[in-house]
Amino acid sequence: MKYLYRLYQLVICLPILLLASVLTSVATVLGCMLGNGHFWGYYPGKYWSWLWVRILLLPVKVEGREHLKKNQSYVFVANHQGAFDIFLIYGFLGRNFKWMMKKGLRKVPLIGIACEYAHHIFVDKSGPSKIRASYDRAREVLKEGMSLVVFPEGARSFTGHMGVFRRGAFMLADELQLPVCPLTINGSFDVKPRMKDIYWAFWHPLKLTIHEPIEPIGKGADNIKNQMNKSYEAIMNGLDKKYQGFVENPDQ
């Protein structure tokens, strides 16, 4: 069955996903150039991500959408199990948002330039001033009423377990007094583990759990600590038992 699934990926999925990636990138760039970035910066990527999951026949379960208020901006924070985190959140969260992502992703052919035109935020860690500029852009996105999705671990897990959370997303939420909404991703590590059989996906169900947002309790260090600790705890408790427990990743 494993080899039949790989043949299906090669013969059916690969051509369709390559074409879809080109069309999505072109639609995003042209749509944003023509002015409606709110629509074109989100929906082509959303349906492209949905297609990735569906064409690979991966079952998806989403829990907790009832926790989200329609007109509220959130700082979403999620564990980073694998490459399919992107497709699961983008395709199934059901919320218009911007990503905070590594600067290196700008170099991905077509996808990188589409993300730039969609005004997703590339985090440049080459120096303090560059990091500050990245967070200034994120601040403006949130001030405009958009939500933001961040992986506070900063890198995909090598084990499926959670690593250390960085404070940046929580500092932004504190500054603008926004709720932080934890997201737990299950199954992504099993579908596409980091640095293993890079050319193939494995069949495994995916699950996205949207936890109850954590409202600010004030402003400053205590609020940052509260939102960060409660987010970490909620995400950890939502993980499958085999992936619960802290493991520090070497590139964090």
Regions found by a protein language model. Give the residues of each.
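Membrane-anchoring hydrophobic helices of lipid-metabolizing enzymes
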Residues: M1-Y74
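Non-catalytic C-terminal accessory region of glycerolipid acyltransferases
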Residues: L4, R132-Q252
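Catalytic core of membrane glycerolipid acyltransferases/transacylases, capturing the structured
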Residues: T24-Y43, I55, K70-P128
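Short glycine/serine/threonine/alanine-rich loop segments
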Residues: L58, H120, L178
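Thr-Gly-centered strand-to-loop micro-motif
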Residues: E63, M100-K102, D124-K125, P152, ...
